[in-house]
Amino acid sequence: MRKLILAAASIAAWAVAGSASAQSPIVIKFSHVVASDTPKGKAADKFKELAEKYTNGKVKVEVYPNSTLYKDKEELEALQLGAVQMLAPSNSKFGPIGIKEFEVFDLPYILPDLKTLRKVTGGPLGGRLLKLLDSKGMTGLAYWDNGFKQMSANKKLIAPADYKGLKFRIQSSKVLEAQFRTLGAIPQVMAFSEVYQALQTGVVDGQENTWSNIYTQKMHEVQKYITTTNHGYIGYVVVVNKKFWDGLPADIRDELSKAMKEATEFGNSQSARENDDALEAIKKTGKSQILTLTPEQDEAMRKAMMPVYKEVASRVGQPLIDEFLKETGRSPIN
């Protein structure tokens, strides 16, 4: 796969050079792993629309949704090598390439709502996290929402004990590994595009995801129960190859930044509605029973997951966790 990515990067570099000399449009390949009708998919399409409009056709954005170009395990390497110019990976994806700080977003129950999230990502802390990406040959442009995660399986998930022994698909994140191990479950890292088949065939028993991801990937068709937990958050960081970005003419970069700002506002403004609509659509299919926890059951789940904070403190950074908790208004969790 690395050889294929290198070959693609060489072709992309040649194409960019050729385009520049012939005054053809600058091409931005924007790869992502979710469906076009998800919050991220719609934001990517909006960026394409605005980027091409504001640059008067000097930039052409090619959006590749649903892992049609690269799977989530491959896309960051493809970006670093220049085979694609832009991605919007989930926060979890940066840990495996050495930027573990982004895994703070994976901590269970660390974010009470999207308003609080905006305070973090739009403030100094969010800016510092984006700056960390420079060392990996990429520039962080924006934070995009998906939403809050729910748990699903073919058995009812009400109490912490219900998770024991079940195999759960996770993104590649040490925090998420710790989360499921704490519940007595077995975490299995798996590409997003492989989850439906893995659930269908029993390779894994359950998964965690947002309503929009569950619905657009049809996971509700192969899971008998979905429990409304809102225990964690899935968000994305829009990144661009740093060498490519820095090499753009200043006026083009300014117009693309403007397009990204507006696409971000557009996508984030409707992410909650997209998830609400997906939940209603799942209910209408009748293929998966939606379970709601009582306040007592919710509290039991929260307490069961709190040991994760201590377990990953040395990896994510206790000062960062403390600062994050202060920003979100949460009390330090012992």
What is the predicted function of each stretch?
Residues 17-19:
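N-terminal signal peptide c-region/cleavage motif recognized by signal peptidases
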